Amino acid sequence: QTALAEAEIEYAEDPCDSIYVKFLVTDDKGLLTQMGADLSKTYFVIWTTTTWTLPANDAICVGPNFTYSLVKWEDEYYVMAEALYESAMKAAGKTGYQVVGTIQGKDLEYMKTAHPFIDRTSLVIVGDHVTLESGTGCVHTAPGHGVDDFNVCQNYPDIPVIVPVDSLGRMTEEAGEKFAGLTTSQANAAIAEHLKETGALFAMEKIIHQYPHCWRCKNPVLFRATE
């Protein structure tokens, strides 16, 4: 194990699971219910390729100038970017859905959601780093494990920086008793399985993506916020 300077990081193709996860809306500022949503079954759908960072999630970031759709499927409602919801629904194998309304990203700010397996609020925030290249336009945000995440959360001083991974790359008790002691790679599988069991897993796909690696040992890099 070693700390790396930014110049010592190189990108390499890395096979991984990409997962889509449902975060239940607990406060919609009255805006989604106006479109007909049942708040007990309304979710922001996030997408991530680093499942092990989900215990550190405490925000969902949207693009302030993007349009977001409220998509109804059966009796559930999903908030996703207008440009991306079709690919997400396809990944989930969901058909027969309809768009019941649209809303600007800036109007989603300060809505609240419930973390899918930790007793914690995940606040909806806005950031200019959000893109429409992949995912759902609703970015899983863990300021303890990502530079963009950390930087955008500086605009929201009430959002804590949670780092449930120790210096050896193992999950701590803060990740939850079910995952404590697991390596990050073990946690990827365990968390995905838990999400599936609890109904919070929206979809999962195998992909190959560009991920930062150590230029010396060629192993994937683990990002942690430190003092």
Predicted region positions:
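Residue patterns forming the tRNA-binding/recognition surfaces of aminoacyl-tRNA synthetases
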Residues: 1-55, 67-69, 107-114, 120-121, ...
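A short, polar/proline- and glycine-enriched secondary-structure boundary/capping micro-motif
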Residues: 56, 88-92, 184
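Short beta-strand-to-turn element immediately C-terminal to the catalytic PLP-Schiff-base lysine
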Residues: 61-63
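Substrate/cofactor-recognition hotspot
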Residues: 125
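Carboxylate/His-rich catalytic cores and anion/metal-binding grooves
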Residues: 68-112
